[in-house]
Amino acid sequence: MDFKGQVVMVTGGARGIGKAIAEGFARRGANLALADISLDSAEETAREMSGYGIKTMAVKLDVSKSEDVSKSFMDITKELGRIDVLINNAGITRDSLVLRMKEEDWDAVLDINLKGVFLCSKEAVKIMVKQRYGRIVNISSVVAFMGNPGQANYSASKAGIIGVTKTIAREYAGRGITVNAVAPGFISTAMTDALAENIKQDMLKSIPVGRFGSVDDVANAVIFLASQDNGYITGQVIHVNGGMYM
């Protein structure tokens, strides 16, 4: 899959899954706009990705603020000319059992994880409608379908992303825009690596393939959905979870 000449925007693109997604696009020739709450981290990742011989841009962005979002999209289109692909990856957690969860923790997670997808998608669609082409891929989670103790806010936000994905897909399918979601399961990160061995073994028992996913497993699914090869898949959720949810 070739993305030469295309501009890909990744929110939360400085670290973790977002960085892996960005690098996957960079290897395939896409120009990158990396939007992150940490400008320093975004700039560091942008410098790293520029080693692939592409144009890169780092943007400080709080996806829950409509003014920030509008300005970021304006800045990106001014600098890079267009936005062909939007990856809504920015997200946070504020874990607690329901009886202990503070209202501000509920609001914070929904604002970033769900409202952020709405605000960024709205700005992207404005651009993509004029281009009569666009790809939006939203990062959901297996907990949107299974739930997870201590994550009522996170599960709700990731489930909400599915509804937003399907609705925008229906609204703009006739304009050359596809909108899909990827729902990762347990992905190997620094946090999972630090878990006690007995906890990791218990988690692995729920995964039929017998291993944690990698950030590249997620990135590969995202890249296909965002490619020109995918013109007939829209409004769908691709599960990347090793079979823990079927």
Per-range role (PLM):
Residues 133, 211-240, 245:
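C-terminal substrate-recognition "lid" of short-chain dehydrogenase/reductases
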Residues 97-98, 105-110, 192, 203:
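Substrate-binding pocket helix/loop in short-chain dehydrogenase/reductase
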